[in-house]
């Protein structure tokens, strides 16, 4: 990341991320199509779960941004021990976040969140079923996002494209099988959509871990890097918290939109959910470019190559 011509480097780093995010956005659209075939109530329930899903992602994704910046900067400075600590501490923080989400679900947070947006018992049941599973098994999402960030931080975005793409494809394949009970699987309805998501995320996380262990010599995995250090945590969240807040604001806005639309009809909420996912399809290339640029800037900032930053 410190020698390749900047324009070529940004394209090399960003293009795989843009492609993988487009595949992710396509999955979101296909997922909505399958859920909609169950019933309007099912689609509305899943739509009402979306703001809290986004909030969960904001915590893990924002932590990932902090890891990305600290790790790439440390590599630029040739501080390899510091880079290892950023990776290890970041993974631990993401697992802690997943445990908090799981505990919150066991305490009834999923049901309370859905019921705060609708009084329809069928919609509430569908939404609670979906959100409870996503929260309890959020370790899949947390692991995938964080482990993929380690590949991004070290300039290996091609591997990230493979893991994200595979996760989304598995998700698309498993959705109809688990939702409608095909090929001997039980018909699980919206629960099937949630389980398909978790399966895709978990397989992507395992593949990303394999790539890190076998193809990423910049990070040296050992037990010592997983011991939390306050200084490392502070540095991760110094960059990560603004990112968390930015995504969380979008989550709050979506929640408020849902409250307004449920006053009209459940159909309005379902349509808004589909529109939101369609809209994200067009913004994903920008997010991919952003994810490709961050490690380039951080690495060259650490290496004190200001001409490449400019």
Q: Which residues fall in each region the model found?
A:
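Residue-level recognition of pore/gate-forming positions within transmembrane alpha-helices
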Residues: 17, 25, 51-54, 89, ...
């Amino acid at each position: 990341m410190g020698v390749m011509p900047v324009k070529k480097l940004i394209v090399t780093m960003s293009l795989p991320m843009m492609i993988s995010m487009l595949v992710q956005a396509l999955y979101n659209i296909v997922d909505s199509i399958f859920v909609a075939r169950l019933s309007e109530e099912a689609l509305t329930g899943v739509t009402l779960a979306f703001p809290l899903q986004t909030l969960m992602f904001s915590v893990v994704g924002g932590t990932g941004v902090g890891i990305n910046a600290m790790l790439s900067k440390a590599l630029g400075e040739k501080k390899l021990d510091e880079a290892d600590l950023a990776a290890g501490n970041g993974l631990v923080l993401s697992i802690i976040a997943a445990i908090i989400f799981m505990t919150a679900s066991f305490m009834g947070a999923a049901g309370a969140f859905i019921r705060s947006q609708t009084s329809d018992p069928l919609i509430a049941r569908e939404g609670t079923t979906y959100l409870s599973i996503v929260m309890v098994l959020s370790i899949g999402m947390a692991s995938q996002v964080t482990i993929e960030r380690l590949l991004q931080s070290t300039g290996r975005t091609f591997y990230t494209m493979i893991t994200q793409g595979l996760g989304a494809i598995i998700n698309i394949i498993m959705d109809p099988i688990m939702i409608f009970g095909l090929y001997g699987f039980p018909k699980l309805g919206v629960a099937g959509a949630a389980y398909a998501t978790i399966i895709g995320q978990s397989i992507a996380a395992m593949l990303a871990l394999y790539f890190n262990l076998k193809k990423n010599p910049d990070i040296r995995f050992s037990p010592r890097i997983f011991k939390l250090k306050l200084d490392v945590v502070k540095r991760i969240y110094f960059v990560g918290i603004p990112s968390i807040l930015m995504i969380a604001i979008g989550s709050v806005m979506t929640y408020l939109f849902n409250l307004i639309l449920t006053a009209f009809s459940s159909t309005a909420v379902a349509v808004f959910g589909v529109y939101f996912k369609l809209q994200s399809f067009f913004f994903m290339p920008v997010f991919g470019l952003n994810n490709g640029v961050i490690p380039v800037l951080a690495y060259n900032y650490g290496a004190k190559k200001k001409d490449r930053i400019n």
